[in-house]
């Protein structure tokens, strides 16, 4: 190994320590046909990073359980926390090509461009949150590639990999689609692996350039927290029809509607349709009570309730949508959210968890986030519960006087 390569390895290690100090999450993607050198390059990088703050993630062809979740779900779940580095051996690009080549969920998508749009918005949201996404595409000449394959065949410990090579996306289809991605996206760095040490040097030089850019960008940023609501609103929530149902009618209806909800739950399961119910509203508006009545007749094996409070330390080290993406339902199941991602433009804004720039772009990000799931057939129903100030005060006083409800009172 040359002295120059050792120098580059040390520099990348130093820069990665600085990105960790600054809380910059790094995602390094390696794509390329089988036996192109992806394993050698990705492992070379992995071994020169701090093992405590780095992770290696290999994308395999989707199995039946994977298909019960949203297309990008596993990548949301495994996002690096701020300051850490993820290495992706094959990535969401290979995942997309698996779907397209094998016509996975063809009846649902019709046009697989919808998944390309999901990838674009996924990356855009992450980049806006200072995630650095570094993409490598590895090329190799046929002679060198055949040499790699022969070495793999000759080793009893790795012979199984050759069979795996034959089970991946056909080489021509993969290359054609990847070249389309590369031609449209300047973030891709193409590396020829024909000469090993030269390939390592090119990888490290590109990493150094991108890490230095990421560090400079974050060091120059200023965080401005301003959660004040300055807009005036010409409409009122109370202009809506708030007609009440009398108690007798309610008691007759609730039993019938709860039974109907149970039937809908089983119909959703049979048709593999995921359902998300989102409840937002003022304090004491009745979110918990509404959720209780919805679930009274449901089969508890098919739903979960997620009570959302202030983000934890671990959640603050991830993209703000990460904690919600992890809880989205698989096919046929129901997830109920008592407060939700809309907190980004509500309580997180007011309490200072989000800077002005972050909450201002959140509305578009939330729309794209929801679309990722509705594109796949997920039903998302959102309810906002409101009440006037007099009724709210009355309920607060009732809580103060009820020992079983005093825990609900907060500052």
PLM regions: where:
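Glycine-rich phosphate-binding loop of ATP-dependent small-molecule kinases
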Residues: 1-411
């Amino acid at each position: 190994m040359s002295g120059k390569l050792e120098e580059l390895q040390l520099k990348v290690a130093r820069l990665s320590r600085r990105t960790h100090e600054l809380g910059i999450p790094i995602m390094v993607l390696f794509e390329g046909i089988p036996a192109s050198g992806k394993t050698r390059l990705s492992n070379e990088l992995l071994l020169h990073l701090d093992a405590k703050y780095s992770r290696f993630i290999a994308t395999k062809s989707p199995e039946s359980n994977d298909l019960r979740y949203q297309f990008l779900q596993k990548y949301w779940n495994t996002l690096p926390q701020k300051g850490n580095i993820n290495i992706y051996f094959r990535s969401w690009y290979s995942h997309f090509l698996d779907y397209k080549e094998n016509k996975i969920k063809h009846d649902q998508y019709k046009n697989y461009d919808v998944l390309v749009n999901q990838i674009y918005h996924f990356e855009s949201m992450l980049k806006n949150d200072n995630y650095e996404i570094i993409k490598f595409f590895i090329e190799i000449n046929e002679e060198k590639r055949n040499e790699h394959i022969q070495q793999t065949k000759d080793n009893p410990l790795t012979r199984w990999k050759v069979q795996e090579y034959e089970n991946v996306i056909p080489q021509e289809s993969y290359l054609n689609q990847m070249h389309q991605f590369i031609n449209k996206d300047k973030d891709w760095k193409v590396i020829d692996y024909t000469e090993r040490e030269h390939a390592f040097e090119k990888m490290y030089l590109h990493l150094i350039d991108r890490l230095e850019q990421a560090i400079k960008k974050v060091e120059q940023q200023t965080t401005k927290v301003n959660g004040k609501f300055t807009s005036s609103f010409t409409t009122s929530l109370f202009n809506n029809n708030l007609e009440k149902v009398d108690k007798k009618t309610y008691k007759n209806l609730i039993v019938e509607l709860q039974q109907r909800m149970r039937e809908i739950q089983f119909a959703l399961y049979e048709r593999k349709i995921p359902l998300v119910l989102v409840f937002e509203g003022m304090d004491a508006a009745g979110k918990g009570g509404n959720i209780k009545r919805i679930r009274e007749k449901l089969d508890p094996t098919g739903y979960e309730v997620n009570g959302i409070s202030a983000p934890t330390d671990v959640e603050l080290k991830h993209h703000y949508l990460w904690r919600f993406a992890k809880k989205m339902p698989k096919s046929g199941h129901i997830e109920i959210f008592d407060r939700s991602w809309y907190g980004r433009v509500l309580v997180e804004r007011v309490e200072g968890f989000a800077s002005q720039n972050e909450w201002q772009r959140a509305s578009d990000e939330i729309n794209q986030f929801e679309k990722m799931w509705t594109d796949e057939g997920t039903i998302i129903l959102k309810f906002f519960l409101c009440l006037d100030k007099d009724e709210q005060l009355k309920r607060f006083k009732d809580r103060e006087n009820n020992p079983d409800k005093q825990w609900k009172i907060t500052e």
